[in-house]
């Protein structure tokens, strides 16, 4: 906001102080002085608006494009054919050349040009916009041409002065159709300028030529490669061709008059002879050649439906640097509160950086343009973090060109664009999911025209979900406004669909009559979830269960409590019951609880009151004796395990979920324990069985086992007991005496080098893979 406030103060001051005083002179080189305050304001303005010096080129190219747009519009109603003094016609393009000996960078356009008065008005007074006045003329009916005026890039009077970031001296030669003479505006940015007829005469025919005498620390801009790189970054999609003059080495050949004429042409690839060129001993000479830089046209400005899929793919590769085709794309135009064009792409591979949780790192995948001029790609939230894998461009006519990124960040217009972008992005995903489902169901997918969307020829949403499902689930936690849209995009495997993903809506559509909610179970893999004892109960009741296999799912369900009016129910939590009890059954359940109360109190005391929150009779239809579940309103064992693994803090390392022990009274081992308990509470066998069943149930539920060594010893005791071995039975004595070894075998063994048998076997095993 500081830059925004400064800009307003500066512009107001310029309006008050922007008058100029013309010194006496003959009008051909007499300096024209700004007031001292204006000179100071110029310095503040340049240094506060522009932190990257390379933007001067963006500004000058934008101005040149603006001038070309103006003449194109004017010539629609009043065409003219101006010529230079040498009889050459100006071209509808921008050209950049160099004079390395003089450290000069030269930019030339064939645009509308300026008269002497316009040079003084637009360049001799800060804050004046030539484009603004041009639009005023159009609105007054001078050369009205409909919507074309919206293509003009504005605020010439401010952007031009960024040239003094790199230039010690600037000369602007300009020729307008409204003037017979070509004039030069010249300044060092020191509070004064010169305005005089160009002594070279009419060298332009029409247009403007800017010659920048570069500062010593800005001579990198004498490099064609640097200029081309800057053009690609900022001005790739300007409407008019941009040529850069380069020196190339070519074989020395005798030129014919015809070839010489071709070299003098201004078409792309035309060559200008360097009068100082010298051939080497190999017959090679250096020539200057015009190279077209902005070959990629702004396809987003074309009508949606008139761009082929191949063109979208080619454009994506050009602007993103990715050699692969995108997975999806969406080309759309938004009109209303804010107007903008956009094309969004989904890459076919995941960038690991997209999982970074560093909010300070900007997302550079979305490039912001204003009237086809690149402004920035360093927004932290043009798309939210969970959509930072999406690449694309946004081009708006409603944003100002010459403001800082910081000011844009606070722009109301930009906030509207952000909201629209998120909705359009999620809409793209939903469209692809719908196409994918239609294909899977054998339906014909229609591609409405005009489209601009990816048209699927085969199912592709599964790949998208496997690549970016984690990002969408993150969105549920970060973006409550779009939570419902996001959950419709979720896909999971289930107990009825182990090989294919289904949506939550598909699950709801095929729920059993009277089913309470959406049942799910999380785990490291489908294979592990299938072995869960709590899944057995659901399968026995013919209830479908969603399989959640990503760690982030545990966090998601803490935010996503329901879908389509159906509650999400975790099978790993206590109290899961698929059948309602009638009155008689409730009485039976109450009496059964009374029967086992003292036994359950004993078990809780045995395992520890601090570890087991309560012991209950399970209502699950299962073959397991014990099931350890999580308390209904607390975190699950899996989430606690994930949090311990993700955090280095002592508190989280000790984090555990509350345990509820569910006991299956119908299991034979439980029945045996109960009988022994009624006789002797301290029965050793019953105690060992209880501990082994409890620790095993903990492992199945992903709860940690407190004492693994004790667990191992109890299993050992139970195994001994099962084969009638006493706990006191010790190891057998060595059986060496059973083996007969002759003296000869001993002598032969002594003669052999000592070999590590185990190492030898490992080496043989390692070598098997090479056969």
Curated annotation (Swiss-Prot):
**Per the entry, what induces it?**
Not induced by stress conditions such as heat, glucose deprivation or treatment with the glycosylation inhibitor tunicamycin.
Query: Binding residues for ATP, per the UniProt record?
Result: 63, 109, 160
* One CC-aspect GO term: endoplasmic reticulum
**SUPFAM superfamilies given in the database record:** ATPase domain of HSP90 chaperone/DNA topoisomerase II/histidine kinase, HSP90 C-terminal domain, Ribosomal protein S5 domain 2-like
Q: Per the database entry, which stretches of residues form a coiled coil?
A: none
What does the record say mutating residue 159 to D does? In OB1; defective lipophosphoglycan (LPG) synthesis with production of a truncated LPG form lacking phosphoglycan repeats; defective addition of phosphoglycan to acid phosphatase
Give a yes or no for keyword ATP-binding in this entry: yes
Q: Gene3D superfamilies, from UniProt? A: 3.30.230.80, 3.40.50.11260, Heat shock protein 90, C-terminal domain, Histidine kinase-like ATPase, C-terminal domain
According to UniProt, where does the site described as Important for ATP hydrolysis lie? 405
Pfam families, from UniProt? Answer: HATPase_c_3, HSP90
Q: Where is it located?
A: Endoplasmic reticulum
The protein's job, in short, is: Molecular chaperone that functions in the processing and transport of secreted proteins. Required for the synthesis of lipophosphoglycan (LPG), a cell surface glycoconjugate. Necessary for the attachment of the galactosyl residue to the mannose within the phosphoglycan repeats of the nascent LPG chain. Also required for addition of phosphoglycan to acid phosphatase. Not required for normal growth. Has ATPase activity. Binds heparin with micromolar affinity which may facilitate infection of host cells.
Describe, as the record does, how this protein assembles with itself and its partners.
Homotetramer.
Family per similarity comment: Belongs to the heat shock protein 90 family.
The name of this protein is Endoplasmin homolog
Q: Its gene?
A: LPG3
């Amino acid at each position: 906001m500081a830059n925004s406030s400064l800009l307003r103060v500066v512009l107001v001051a310029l309006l008050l102080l922007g008058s100029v005083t013309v010194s006496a002179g003959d009008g051909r080189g007499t300096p024209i002085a700004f007031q001292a305050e204006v000179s100071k304001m110029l310095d503040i303005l340049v240094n506060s608006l522009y932190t990257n010096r390379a933007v001067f080129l963006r500004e000058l190219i934008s101005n040149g494009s603006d001038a070309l747009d103006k003449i194109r519009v004017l010539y629609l109603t009043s065409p003219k054919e101006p010529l230079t003094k040498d009889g050459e016609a100006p071209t509808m393009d921008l050209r950049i050349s160099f004079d390395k000996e003089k450290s000069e960078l030269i930019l030339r356009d064939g645009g509308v040009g300026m008269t002497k008065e316009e040079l003084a008005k637009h360049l001799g007074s800060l804050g004046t916009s030539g484009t603004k006045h041009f639009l005023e003329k159009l609105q007054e009916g001078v050369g009205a041409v409909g919507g074309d005026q919206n293509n003009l890039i504005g605020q010439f009077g401010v952007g031009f002065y960024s040239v003094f970031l790199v230039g010690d001296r600037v000369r602007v030669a300009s020729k307008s159709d409204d003037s017979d003479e070509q004039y030069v505006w010249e300044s060092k940015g020191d509070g004064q300028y010169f305005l005089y007829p160009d002594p070279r005469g009419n060298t332009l025919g029409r247009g403007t030529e800017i010659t920048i005498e570069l500062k010593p620390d800005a001579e990198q801009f004498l490099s064609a490669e640097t200029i081309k790189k800057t053009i690609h970054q900022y001005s790739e999609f300007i409407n008019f061709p941009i040529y850069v003059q380069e020196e190339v080495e070519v074989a020395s050949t005798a030129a014919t008059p015809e070839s010489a004429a071709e070299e003098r042409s201004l078409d792309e690839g035309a060559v200008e002879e360097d009068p100082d060129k010298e051939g080497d001993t190999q017959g090679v000479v250096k020539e200057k050649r015009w190279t077209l830089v902005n070959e990629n046209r702004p396809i987003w400005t074309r009508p949606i439906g008139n761009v082929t899929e191949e063109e979208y793919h080619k454009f994506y590769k050009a602007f993103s640097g990715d050699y692969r085709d995108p997975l999806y794309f969406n080309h759309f135009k938004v009109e209303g509160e804010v107007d903008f064009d956009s094309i969004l792409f989904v890459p076919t591979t995941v960038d690991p950086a997209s999982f970074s949780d560093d909010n300070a790192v900007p997302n550079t995948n979305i490039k912001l343009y204003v009237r086809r001029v690149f402004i920035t790609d360093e927004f932290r939230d043009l798309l939210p973090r969970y959509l930072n894998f999406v690449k694309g461009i946004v081009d708006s006519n409603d944003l100002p060109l010459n403001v800082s990124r910081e000011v844009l960040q606070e722009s109301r217009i930009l906030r509207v664009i952000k909201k629209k972008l998120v909705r359009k992005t999620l809409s793209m995903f939903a469209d692809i999911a719908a196409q994918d489902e239609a294909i899977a169901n054998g339906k014909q997918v229609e591609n409405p025209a005009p489209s601009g969307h990816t048209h699927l020829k085969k199912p592709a949403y599964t790949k998208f979900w496997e690549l970016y499902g984690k990002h969408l689930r993150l969105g549920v936690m970060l973006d409550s406004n779009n939570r419902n849209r996001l959950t419709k995009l979720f896909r999971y495997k289930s107990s009825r669909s182990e090989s294919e993903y289904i949506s939550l809506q598909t699950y709801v559509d095929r729920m059993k009559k009277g089913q309470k909610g959406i049942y799910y179970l999380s785990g490291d893999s489908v294979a592990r979830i299938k072995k869960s004892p709590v899944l057995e109960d659901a399968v026995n009741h013919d209830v479908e269960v969603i399989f959640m296999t990503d760690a982030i799912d545990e966090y998601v369900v803490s935010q996503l409590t329901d879908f389509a009016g159906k509650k999400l129910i975790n099978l790993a939590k206590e109290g899961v019951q698929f059948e309602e009890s009638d009155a008689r059954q409730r009485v039976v359940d109450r009496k059964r609880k009374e029967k086992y109360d003292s036994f359950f109190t004993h078990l809780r005391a045995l395992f520890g009151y601090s570890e087991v929150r309560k012991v209950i009779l399970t209502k699950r239809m299962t073959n397991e004796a014990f099931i350890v579940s999580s308390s209904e309103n607390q975190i699950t064992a899996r989430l606690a395990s994930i949090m311990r693994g993700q955090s280095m803090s002592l508190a989280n390392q000790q984090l555990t979920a509350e345990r509820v022990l569910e006991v299956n009274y119908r299991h034979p081992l439980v029945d045996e324990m109960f009988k022994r308990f009624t006789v002797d509470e301290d029965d050793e066998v019953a105690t060992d069985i209880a501990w082994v069943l409890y620790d095993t149930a903990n492992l199945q539920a992903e709860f940690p086992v407190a004492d693994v060594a004790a667990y191992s010893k109890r299993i050992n005791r139970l195994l001994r007991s099962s084969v009638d071995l006493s706990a006191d039975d010790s190891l057998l004595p060595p059986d060496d005496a059973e083996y007969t070894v002759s003296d000869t075998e001993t002598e032969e063994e002594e003669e052999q080098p000592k070999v590590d048998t185990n190492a030898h076997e490992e080496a043989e095993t390692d070598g098997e893979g090479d056969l």
